[in-house]
């Protein structure tokens, strides 16, 4: 049994916000955490060479398409709302195919590297596993 490290208030707020926005969009919160790990390394003020911003690396053009002009992409909840909405949009386009939706999200559709990185982070770092005793008991 390994005990998880204690989270500070900011860490708890991040996890709660991810859970809220992911479930609101019909996404697995652990998938969203894996995407955030790969996209920004959980850096709030990350900016890519293409101009993508924040935790989920949202491109500013999305503000004009689906948001309001005063939306701030470096705000945690705003960034998560956009990122989760965009990923849901791509999942719908790809009829639930997570691999292809991740490729669209990153702009690398058809290239396996990015979806594989997110999938690995999701499954190795963020996938919840029941302890063996609980799994055997059927809980």
What is the meaning of each model-derived region?
Residues 1-139:
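Catalytic glycan-binding domains that act on GlcNAc-containing polysaccharides
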